[in-house]
Structure formats: structure tokens, C-alpha cells
Amino acid sequence: MSQGVQFNRLMLEMRAMQTDAMARSKPEVQTQEVGAPSFSDMLGQAVNKVHETQQVSSQLASAFEMGQGGVDLTEVMIASQKASVSFQAMTQVRNKLVQAYQDIMQMPV
């Protein structure tokens, strides 16, 4: 009878250790903080920033072409390159998002 009691106690201890280990291995769910921007908000802000950069570049180029004082060719070229780089980066992000969407849609359910 003593062996049966020890066996039961051992099984209870093993189950307790198992549930304890399972509770520790579960990843904690990350919740979005209140007030934190969503992905769509951040993406929209990035697109707006690229648009603003292109507008500034266009305005500087127009001012330089009209011969307005205070507008330097180097400023125009730097603004143009900033607009170009930001647009290329946005295009690459879009391509990666489209590719990720297509990969997800092709996954078997």
C-alpha cells in the first residue's frame, strides 16, 4: 500500500511540474498600448512624409528655375535626391507588403 501512495504522490508532483512548465512556456500576449499608432496610421504618415518631401523638392526646383534669390543649386539637388530616395524606399516597402500578402494568400488553410 505504501508503494501505491508514493506512486500517486509522485504522479501528482509530476503533473504539477508539467502544468507549471506549460504555464511558463506560453508566450505572453503583447497588447497594443492605448494611444500607440496602428500600422495603417504609421504607413499613412510615411506616405504623407514622402509626399511632403517631393513637394519641397518641386518648390525648390521651381524657385531655382525662376531665379529667385536664396535658392542654391546644391539645395535643389539635395532636395531632389532626398525625394528620390524616399520614393524608392516607399516603393520597396510597398513591394514587400504586396509580396507578403501574396505569400499569405497562397498558404494552405
Swiss-Prot record:
Pfam family name, one: FliE
Subcellular location(s) per record: Bacterial flagellum basal body
Main subcellular location of this protein, as a coarse class: other
GO-annotated cellular components: bacterial-type flagellum basal body
One annotated GO biological process: bacterial-type flagellum-dependent cell motility
Keyword annotations of the record: Bacterial flagellum
Transcription listed as a keyword: no
Protein family membership: Belongs to the FliE family.
Protein name: Flagellar hook-basal body complex protein FliE
UniProt source species: Stutzerimonas stutzeri (strain A1501) (Pseudomonas stutzeri)
Lineage: Bacteria, Pseudomonadati, Pseudomonadota, Gammaproteobacteria, Pseudomonadales
